[in-house]
Amino acid sequence: MTESTSRRPAYARLLDRAVRILAVRDHSEQELRRKLVAPIMGKNGPEEIDATAEDYERVIAWCHEHGYLDDSRFVARFIASRSRKGYGPARIRQELNQKGISREATEKAMRECDIDWCALARDHATRKYDEPLPTVFSEKVKIQRFLLYRGYLMEDIQDIWRNFAD
């Protein structure tokens, strides 16, 4: 730790660290808290910030007030990002839960997002297994297992073959 950083108050150092973290990408409040509490890797090894619980709360409140930290924005962007990567709603819900987002906030954001999960599952399956999708049972099971692993719901997966038969 340099002499100039050791003289800065813990609140200022925490605030600087929070803004740097949030400048890279959106985080949930729980993620930001976890990263702020973690020791900083300095030139001479891990460095602790001598901050109180009140300092952490003030930093989180400041980030909320100035629009740097917004869980609803984080959830909307996270859903859009993960769906573009081919993940289904079940997997996205689980990941948001792990990031400390409440079930109510997740469900609200899932209802508000304009994503056709069935079409997304079909696109993902055709990218992996080519068009036309197989109708042989053993091949269908393989695709079904793949899509379930990616987090798609069984009803969306079954709709692929229902729509395919039409």
Curated annotation (Swiss-Prot):
One GO biological process this protein is involved in is:
regulation of DNA repair
This chain's protein is named: Regulatory protein RecX
- Name the species this protein comes from: Shigella dysenteriae serotype 1 (strain Sd197)
The cross-references to InterPro entries, in alphabetical order and at most eight, read: RecX_HTH_1st, RecX_HTH_2nd, RecX_HTH_3rd, Regulatory_RecX, WH-like_DNA-bd_sf
Q: What keywords are assigned to this protein?
A: Cytoplasm
Classification via NCBIfam families: PRK00117.1-1 (NF001052)
The family assignment reads: Belongs to the RecX family.
Q: Which gene encodes it?
A: recX
Subcellular location per the Swiss-Prot or TrEMBL entry = Cytoplasm
Pfam families xref list? RecX_HTH1 (PF21982), RecX_HTH2 (PF02631), RecX_HTH3 (PF21981)
Protein purpose? Modulates RecA activity.
Indicate where this protein is primarily found: cytoplasm
According to the UniProt record, one GO cellular component term is: cytoplasm
Q: Which HAMAP family match?
A: RecX (MF_01114)
